[in-house]
Design a protein with these regions (language model features):
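Short coil/turn segments that connect the beta-strands within blades of beta-propeller domains
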Residues: 10-11, 59-60, 107-109, 150-151, ...
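Beta-propeller blade signature
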Residues: 30, 74-82, 119-121, 164-166
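Blade-level signature of beta-propeller repeat domains, shared across WD40, Kelch, NHL, RCC1
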Residues: 162, 257-261, 292-329
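Short loop/turn segments immediately following beta-strands, especially the blade-tip
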Residues: 28, 162-174, 219-223, 262-271, ...
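Extracytoplasmic beta-rich repeat domains
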Residues: 1-7, 35-57, 67-71, 85-108, ...
C-alpha cells in the first residue's frame, strides 16, 4: 500500500505504493484500471523508507517520481491508459521522498522536483529541463514538499537546512537567494529552518516552520535571518512534525501529538488561539533505524480538511470531526 497521499482526478484515484507500484483505480467501484510496477518496468530503486511521493495530474498526464533507469527519475504517463509519454533525469542519485508540484511562473507551467542532489524545474508537457539548482543533501532525505509563494520557492531539510530560490518573473528560470548553514543537527547548531517531515509555509516575506527538534521558527525569507523561535507548538524531540493548513487569516496546525492548534504566524512571533486533542498517536519512532534515539509515539499522517470537518488518522483509527462553531454551542 501507499505511504504517499492518493491522488484523485475525477472518477480515478492514483496511488504510488511503498514498494513502487503505481496503480489507477475507479473511485466508484474500486476496480483496478491500470498498473505499472516501477521496480520491474523501470528498474526503480525503492528508497530506504519506502517510496513516498504522491503523483500529480497535469492535463492528460499523471507524473510520478519513479527513480528508474535509464533516465527515468521522473516519468509522465497517460492518465487514462498508463502508457509512458515521457521520461526525464538520470538516476545517479537517490530520488528522495518529496512529492513533485506544478507552478505557474515566468510565463510557463513548471514541474518542480526536489531530489537528493538538486531542485529541478521541467516542462510538464515534455520533460524538458528549464533550470536546475544543485543542493546535495544528507541521507537522500528530500522529504518536505517544495513551497512556492509569489517569487519565493523554498525547500527545507533536516541536515542541510533551507534553500530559498527566487523565481524569474519573465522566463522559466530561478536563482538561489540563500541557503542555511549549520555545525550539526541540534537546534543550537542550526541557523535557519531544518525541517524533516513538516512542510514549512511562506507568508509574505517570511518563512515559518518546525525545525529538526521541534523548534518553531520565524525566518526572514529575503535573507534567511532567524527572527524568533518558540518551543510551544511541539514536543521538543528529534523528527518533530506539524502540518500547516491555511484558513483565512490563521492556520490549522496538527502536531505529532495529535493536537489541533489554531494559530497565527507573524514576524513578531507565534500566536496560539486555541488547541484541542484530536487523536492519540499510536505509531512509534522506535529510536530510528539505529535505535539510538528516544522511542516515542507520533502522529505522522497528514490530516484532511473539507466541508468544515477535519479527517485524521493514526495506524488504528480514522476519525472525522466537525470544525463548525454551531456544533459546539
Amino acid at each position: 500500500g501507499p505511504r504517499a497521499v492518493p491522488t484523485v482526478d475525477e472518477h480515478r484515484v492514483y496511488t504510488l505504493g511503498a514498494a513502487g507500484m503505481l496503480s489507477c483505480f475507479d473511485t466508484e467501484t474500486g476496480d483496478l484500471l491500470w498498473r505499472v510496477d516501477t521496480v520491474t518496468d523501470y528498474d526503480a530503486t525503492v528508497p530506504v523508507q519506502g517510496t513516498s511521493q504522491a503523483p500529480i495530474v497535469e492535463e492528460n498526464l499523471l507524473i510520478a517520481a519513479v527513480g528508474g533507469e535509464p533516465d527515468a527519475k521522473v516519468v509522465a504517463f497517460n492518465k487514462v491508459t498508463g502508457d509512458e509519454v515521457w521520461r526525464s533525469l538520470d538516476n545517479i542519485s537517490e530520488t528522495g521522498y518529496s512529492a513533485p508540484i506544478i507552478i505557474d511562473a515566468g510565463g510557463a507551467r513548471q514541474l518542480i522536483l526536489w531530489h537528493a542532489t538538486a531542485i529541478t524545474s521541467l516542462n510538464p508537457k515534455t520533460g524538458e529541463i528549464y533550470w536546475n539548482q544543485d543542493f546535495t543533501i544528507g541521507g537522500g532525505m528530500a522529504i518536505t514538499t517544495p513551497v512556492r509563494s509569489g517569487r519565493y520557492l523554498a525547500v527545507s531539510q533536516f541536515f542541510n537546512g533551507t534553500m530559498m530560490m527566487a523565481l524569474n518573473p519573465d522566463r522559466p528560470d530561478a536563482r538561489m537567494l540563500w541557503k542555511g548553514r549549520n555545525r550539526g543537527e541540534l537546534p543550537d547548531q542550526t541557523d535557519s529552518l531544518h525541517s524533516i517531515i513538516s512542510t514549512p509555509i511562506v507568508v509574505g516575506d517570511h518563512l515559518y516552520g518546525i525545525g529538526s527538534y521541534g523548534e518553531l521558527r520565524g525566518i526572514d525569507a529575503t535573507n534567511g535571518e532567524r527572527l524568533w523561535e518558540s518551543d510551544q507548538m511541539n514536543e521538543q524531540d528529534r523528527w518533530a512534525t506539524a502540518y500547516f493548513v491555511r484558513h483565512r487569516d490563521r492556520y490549522f496546525v496538527v502536531n505529532d501529538s495529535g493536537e489541533l492548534i489554531l494559530a497565527r504566524f507573524n514576524p513578531d512571533g507565534y500566536e496560539e488561539i486555541d488547541r484541542t486533542r484530536l487523536l492519540r498517536p499510536t505509531t512509534r519512532t522506535r529510536g530510528g533505524i539505529s535505535g539510538r534515539y528516544r522511542d516515542r509515539a507520533v502522529l505522522w499522517a497528514h490530516p484532511a480538511f473539507a466541508n468544515q470537518h477535519v479527517v485524521v488518522r493514526n495506524d488504528e483509527t480514522v476519525v472525522r470531526l466537525s470544525l463548525a462553531s454551531t456544533d459546539y454551542q
